[in-house]
Amino acid sequence: MSEQKTEQKTDDQVSFAIKLSDPTFFNEAVKAINEIVEDATFSIDQDGLYFRGMDASHVALIDLISPNQDWEKWEIKNNGNFALRLDQFCKVLNSLKKKESLSLSTEGGSILHIKTPSMQMNVRTIETSSIDCPLPKISYNSLFSISGNELSRIIKQVQSVSEYIKIVTLDRLVEFSGRGDNGDVKINLEKGDPYLIEIDNRESSEAVYSLEYLQAFIKHTKSHVFTIEYSKKMPMRIETKLDHNTRVHFYLAPRVEN
């Protein structure tokens, strides 16, 4: 993937008050992001909340778009950025009661105020990062949509013998396979299978990807449907809709085999 450039800056102008009646989808998104970065700079404006970041090895990239329509309250005084240590923020989100409302606010960006019906917490933000992290511009030849729970099951099966997963798509078939010192495995899903929701091939494709990164991403969002696009030896693009309009896109570079 392309190089990622980071320029440190301090944003002391951002000011907002937003609320979710059920923060489940936001919790899932933050946990998925935390799998590839330790610190995250979020952008917020009148239209929504955004994040885009790449892991240190430049193997995986996550792009989050959460429009204001998915939030119960959306009051933005000043657009801007705010950055958090995600380990700390995830601990806060994990402590929430199931479907307990969540309010986030800040005046100036240095402190994030977190409020639920039973708790109030103030968390100091960290220095924000302005990141040049363009999305890969790729024309994909193969697309399929799959149940997240089924994809999670397939990944676990392939992980039992390999650190990588090979994906092959034909006209009506998606084949997942792995091979290692202890054996090999192959799983096929054909058009018409209830877990294979959609398949569309411009031409047959084949590529190999890291199971470590795939598993890390989907384990927090596996209750959703994944739409996967890829081409021969090209980065994979996964889209999952977490709420009515909130989407996460995950890009994963292929393993280059000799």
What spans do the regions from the language model cover?
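DNA polymerase sliding clamps and clamp-related checkpoint/processivity subunits
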Residues: 1-34, 39-160, 168-258
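Polyanion-binding surfaces on beta-sheet-dominated domains and ring/shell assemblies
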Residues: 165
